């Protein structure tokens, strides 16, 4: 057993870049029969972030599960990022997480103290969210993986979906893109410690604070940007809402250095899976570089919220979130349904 093995050396794909591609996933899920239950408010019909089940007229439960292999070598940080990523789905649905359970796969070649550090990172992030951890499940596995099964609660009218964007809405993204590319560069030892800290800080920031900034505002649609990239999750919102979303590429926040690494070809395998599925679902109308297109489809790990809301409420949201992050920006608008669900300007 070793304390010195790099966690990222034990996995081929890191973080949300390890997700099964959206095309394969869609082909499998679309072939399965659907459960019919009048209390199931949100299932997987529109690829939403979590399921929502009605408990009574005043309460719904939001359920989600998310886990993945490490994208960083520090065990504690890995635990924090994985927990923040799992908790995010509840925030994206308009709820607050209440209870979580650990899911951990752990190899015998690693010292057990590393497992403790991973779990400690998850514990601290769940505590920050105001939720509790009440058990979990472990599996012996050559590839380490960690995440959470999370339950949250909300009132029925508080639920947000990824399928209710309105014509005239603006689109806000709360975290910068390029996380998958930067993690790939870090695994190749191409970036320094300060940049790694910057990227891990972005990943480990809870979307709790962005969600709290929506209080009292008219939010029509919401999702979080994770493994399918901005274009992928934007497509799910546009398709589910039966609208077209226009993205203004020059306003999209991007981590410094991500475009340079993309130009060098330092991109995660998951990006190719995303592109294979999404290539006929968006159109580029601007003269933008290939590396910028790559960043727009880059798989994000614990990415930001993508919000669709009226412009007047967007301005208030941006003024509120300034104290939490410098990255939140208006990056697009919602149009009537056109030839393509996503248009890149």
UniProtKB/Swiss-Prot annotation:
Its EC number is 2.7.9.3. Binds 1 Mg(2+) ion per monomer. It catalyses: hydrogenselenide + ATP + H2O = selenophosphate + AMP + phosphate + 2 H(+). InterPro entries: PurM-like_C_dom, PurM-like_C_sf, PurM-like_N, PurM-like_N_sf, SelD_I, SPS/SelD. It holds the Pfam family AIRS_C. Keywords: ATP-binding, Kinase, Magnesium, Metal-binding, Nucleotide-binding, Selenium, Transferase. The active site is at residue 16. GO terms for cellular component: cytoplasm. One of its GO terms (biological process) is selenocysteine biosynthetic process. Gene3D superfamilies: PurM-like C-terminal domain, PurM-like, N-terminal domain. ATP binds at residues 19, 46-48, 66, 89, 136-138. Its cofactor is Mg(2+). The keyword Aminoacyl-tRNA synthetase does not apply. GO terms for molecular function: ATP binding; magnesium ion binding; selenide, water dikinase activity. The keyword NADP does not apply. Mg(2+) binds at residues 49, 89, 224. The record marks 19 as: Important for catalytic activity. Homodimer. Belongs to the selenophosphate synthase 1 family. Class I subfamily. Synthesizes selenophosphate from selenide and ATP. This is Selenide, water dikinase. It comes from Clostridium botulinum (strain Alaska E43 / Type E3).
């Amino acid at each position: 057993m070793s304390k010195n093995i790099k966690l990222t050396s034990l996995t081929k794909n890191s973080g949300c870049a390890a997700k099964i591609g959206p095309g394969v996933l869609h082909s499998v899920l679309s072939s399965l029969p659907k459960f019919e239950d009048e209390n199931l408010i949100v299932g997987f019909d529109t690829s939403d972030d979590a399921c929502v089940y009605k408990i009574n007229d005043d309460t719904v439960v939001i359920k989600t599960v998310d886990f993945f292999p490490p994208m960083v070598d520090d065990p504690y940080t890995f635990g924090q990022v994985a927990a923040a990523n799992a908790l995010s789905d509840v925030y994206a649905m308009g709820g607050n997480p209440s209870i979580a359970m650990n899911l951990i796969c752990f190899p015998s070649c690693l010292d057990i103290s590393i497992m403790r550090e991973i779990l400690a990172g998850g514990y601290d992030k769940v505590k920050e969210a105001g939720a509790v951890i009440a058990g979990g499940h472990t599996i012996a596995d050559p590839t380490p993986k960690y995440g959470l099964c999370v339950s949250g609660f909300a009132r029925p009218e508080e639920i947000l979906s990824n399928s209710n964007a309105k014509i005239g809405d603006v689109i806000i993204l709360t975290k910068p893109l390029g996380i998958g590319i930067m993690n790939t560069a870090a695994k190749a030892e191409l970036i320094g410690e300060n940049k790694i800290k910057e990227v891990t800080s972005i990943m480990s920031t809870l979307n709790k604070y962005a969600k709290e900034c929506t209080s009292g505002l008219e939010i029509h649609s919401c999702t979080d940007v994770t493994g399918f990239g901005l274009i992928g999750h934007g497509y799910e919102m546009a398709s589910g809402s039966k609208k077209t979303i226009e993205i203004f590429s020059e306003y999209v926040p991007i981590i410094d250095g991500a475009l340079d690494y993309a130009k060098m070809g330092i991109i995660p395998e998951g990006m190719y899976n995303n592109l294979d599925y999404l290539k006929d679902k968006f159109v580029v109308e601007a003269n933008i570089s290939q590396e910028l297109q790559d960043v727009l489809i880059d798989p994000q790990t614990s990415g930001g919220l993508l919000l669709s809301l009226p412009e007047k409420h967007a301005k208030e949201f941006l003024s509120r979130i300034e104290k939490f992050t410098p990255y939140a920006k208006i990056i697009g608008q919602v149009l009537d349904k056109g030839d393509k669900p996503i248009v890149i300007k």
